[in-house]
Amino acid sequence: MNIIHEELNKLGIACDSFSILQDKDGVTVARIVSGEKSYVVKCFQKDEHKREIGNYQLLVSLGVPTIRVIASTDSALLLEDIDCSPTYRLGIEEDMSDPEVGRRIAVWYKLLHSRGYGYVCQSGESMYDEADFFTLENIACIKEKTGSQDAPAWVLLEQNYAAINELLCKARRTITYNDFYYTNMVVAKDKSSALMFVYNLLGKGYAYTDVRNVLSSLSEEAGKAFLDEYGEFDPIEKALDDVVSVVVTLHLACQRDEFPWWAQALLDELNTTFIEKIENMRRVL
């Protein structure tokens, strides 16, 4: 593919062969063989995806572990090939039920959040923030696109929107990963450490968004291990997230051509537990 050869030329990498790992939504990922070495090159055709290049640089500057970046251009990253690493392996589905892995990834998230508070306070004004999607306009669009206009929960939410949004704006922000799943995880072969990679959705937010994101994918036992290692979270953030995350996730789902399966449970929740979550939020206000 032309884009791969163009970026490799910029990087000064001779390519003996390559195989495409991903080619979707303007992001092309390929494994490159150059002599006796193997790399992974990630090429970005859209500006909104190019922020991942800067996000790698940001995490390195903060001392948050990432996979190794060999080189970069303004449109591509040349990364170590984890499949050839003597130390690490890519995450597997079984990791989601492994308490040891749960503990190790908690260490990474705790470091990300602790280092992120200061950075966001000083330099995070323009960072991606999923909470920006919590608007009355987006709520109206969700109702229309999902045909859920008659759900009583929407009335209760709109009545309390101003107070909830005020608390949301005041919530302390840190760097948040926003994209947890085993396919985005790297684990040490001896399980001594673990880290996340793929940083396109990295942004700012309150820390509990990541905690919820991780716990939703881990088994109960692995989740308990994660929380034991991560430590306490702010219960007000949880109450806030219980409401805001439903709107944000449904908004993102409604941007798809077809409504995704992973958002169906939240749509069903509009007529069940969502009202209870809003009522709980009202008690916090």
Q: What residue ranges belong to the model's regions?
A:
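Short beta-strand segments
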Residues: 42-43, 177-178, 198
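Short, surface-exposed acidic
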Residues: 14-18, 150-154, 233-241
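ATP-binding pocket architecture of kinase catalytic cores
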Residues: 27, 33-122
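Conserved NTP-binding catalytic cores of kinases and kinase-like/nucleotidyltransferase enzymes
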Residues: 1-72, 169, 188-194, 283-285
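An alpha-helical support segment within catalytic cores of ATP-dependent transferases
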Residues: 2-9, 117-178, 188, 270-284
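Active-site Asp-x-Gly
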Residues: 175, 188-229, 235
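Helix-rich C-terminal or lid/interface subdomains of diverse kinases
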Residues: 103, 213, 221, 228-285
